[in-house]
Curated annotation (Swiss-Prot):
This is 3-hydroxybutyryl-CoA dehydrogenase. It holds the Pfam family 3HCDH. The record marks 143 as: Important for catalytic activity. The keyword RNA-binding does not apply. Signal peptide: none annotated. Belongs to the 3-hydroxyacyl-CoA dehydrogenase family. It catalyses: 3-hydroxybutanoyl-CoA + NAD(+) = acetoacetyl-CoA + NADH + H(+); (3S)-3-hydroxybutanoyl-CoA + NADP(+) = acetoacetyl-CoA + NADPH + H(+). It comes from the Bacteria. One of its GO terms (molecular function) is NAD+ binding. The keyword Oxidoreductase applies. It comes from Mycobacterium tuberculosis (strain ATCC 25618 / H37Rv). Optimum pH is 10. SUPFAM superfamilies: 6-phosphogluconate dehydrogenase C-terminal domain-like, NAD(P)-binding Rossmann-fold domains. One of its GO terms (biological process) is fatty acid beta-oxidation.
Amino acid sequence: MSDAIQRVGVVGAGQMGSGIAEVSARAGVEVTVFEPAEALITAGRNRIVKSLERAVSAGKVTERERDRALGLLTFTTDLNDLSDRQLVIEAVVEDEAVKSEIFAELDRVVTDPDAVLASNTSSIPIMKVAAATKQPQRVLGLHFFNPVPVLPLVELVRTLVTDEAAAARTEEFASTVLGKQVVRCSDRSGFVVNALLVPYLLSAIRMVEAGFATVEDVDKAVVAGLSHPMGPLRLSDLVGLDTLKLIADKMFEEFKEPHYGPPPLLLRMVEAGQLGKKSGRGFYTY
């Protein structure tokens, strides 16, 4: 078994990938981030720089620590540049076919036999992407939460064939190096958090759809009555209604249970491009 993880690769520099890269670099780890296009690399780098600047302004990171983190980040459009990584975390679009193709390529490219290949998927069973590799025993789920620099939880998902040494090594990295709280769970769609969260969000949408209560009153009831920091409909907007639908679709496909099924109102809003905060309009206007 190789030494402690010091070289990390991240596939995808979107909201999640850039956050994972940032927290890894802030922890003193050498990080290589892959995106297939220079424009995506520029966007990802800018996202990380802005996040670090906010952290400096908030007094959470010194300017020296910011500069050190940025110095540990490398960006590439060549997947082969991840060949020497000890841990590669995939954080691309929530599409099984796309993820499977990436894992097949990573399995070919990453040469260290002890290297771990991890997916940040929030809903796809890990075995589905592990099956695309010739070494599924080194594949596991490592699901971070948005925003990655702020939320402390990581779900670590073992499949039926994941090597325990790989899981233990990854857990040590996430907890000791990144300072995350790790929850282990078995390989089923939604894992722990989304299996609880998604039915709750969909139930709130159904309540509004049925005219039982307004968007504002549903959120007010949860915030004022349950001390949640945010109501379910505003949270749905933050997650992204298209993302919520994708996760719900995957969970309904796996479990065939009605409470995982996306309600018609959610479907219509996604079709109309009302995706929540990122599009400027969802249950609220931004």
